[in-house]
Amino acid sequence: MFKALLLGALSSVNIAIHGGSAVQAAPDPGALADHLSQTKVMYYGSWRCPACQYQGRLFGDAVTRLPYVECGKPKELPIQAAACQQKEIRRYPTWILPNGERREGVQSLEDLQIWSGMSQTP
């Protein structure tokens, strides 16, 4: 009985949050990568970082279109490493909006879409 009440309450919350409509489909990774690049949202990471590798896999082939700064190769990419120091990057991955707002850790495509201000209409 308690489980049935709990499930009913959770369903009501879900309907209230989502407005009773179908959940929005995940954004197109390529379109999102292009949007992030065009709006100057920067992605800081390291080639050694498992979380960064996972973040990249979420974008699939579009990962090459991301505005990425490599923080883990200071000898090979000193300008990028200096940018990481200037932005005080302490965790990977780190995403930074042009206004300085940041998110650390792996972000879902949906969260990046909303956070970056990308239109959610297909």
Which residue ranges define each predicted feature?
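Boundary at the C-terminal end of the N-terminal hydrophobic targeting segment
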Residues: 22-25
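Solvent-exposed loop/turn segments at secondary-structure junctions
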Residues: 47-51, 72-74, 90-91, 100-103
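Bacterial N-terminal signal peptides that target proteins for export
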Residues: 1-6
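Local sequence-structure signature of Cys/Sec-based thiol-disulfide redox active-site neighborhoods
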Residues: 27-67
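Structural microenvironment flanking redox-active thiols in thiol-disulfide oxidoreductases
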Residues: 74-83
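Non-catalytic, surface beta->alpha helical segment in thiol-disulfide oxidoreductase systems
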Residues: 96-122
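Structural micro-motif
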Residues: 84-96
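Bacterial N-terminal signal peptides
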Residues: 8-16
